[in-house]
């Protein structure tokens, strides 16, 4: 996996005629870093991810199902949380399919899945690189599924379980090479600052912090608090922005 600071060409001589960006003082910006580690490169052996946990309900579907719900391939729709939309039935239909799979979804969980694969992490083992995820889920049928699915990837879930609430889910319909997504945001957007405070010592024990972009817009105060601790200790902070509007929002903040 390429580093953020890896040049396009390892042969420096081939890049001698390419000018590097500079600031108003003529300093080469390509050599700047957000962290001052001195002459030592820190050992980053753990990462904690702050994100919105989503349970993907994935299955192959037929064209008739698309027509029934008046959807288009490539659609990503938000389903009303109160469940009064006609589209609500799509989740039941997907779960009745013989090909249904329950997969940790969302941008952060997808990133952690790739990270686990790259690091060859083993399920429920003490891996050399420790990865955890903090977020909120509902006390429902998806609770155990999402906890087990992350554990199978070698990711330790640190979840606030909200009684009387329901886990965020996304219905994913697949037809040949096309997909559609029906997301219902629920418990994942209600992570409390109290839960963060209760687990603060554990959170800041990690060497790096990975923040999903949606958390910056939905839980800005939590993100700000954790970033202050990680910056104070000169630790690595990673953001993942899914949409340009999130980047604009964060820049303004």
Annotate the PLM regions.
Residues 71-92, 144:
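Acidic-glycine-rich active-site phosphate/pyrophosphate-binding loop
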Residues 108-112, 143, 223:
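A general structural signal for well-ordered alpha-helical segments in protein cores
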Residues 86-99, 154:
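Glycine/charged-rich beta-loop-alpha catalytic/anionic-binding loops adjacent to active sites
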Residues 60, 65, 83, 114-117:
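N-terminal low-complexity, intrinsically disordered patches enriched in charged
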Residues 102-132:
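Active-site alpha-helical elements of protease catalytic centers
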Residues 2-76, 100-103, 125-130, 136-138, ...:
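Ribokinase/PfkB-type carbohydrate-kinase core domain
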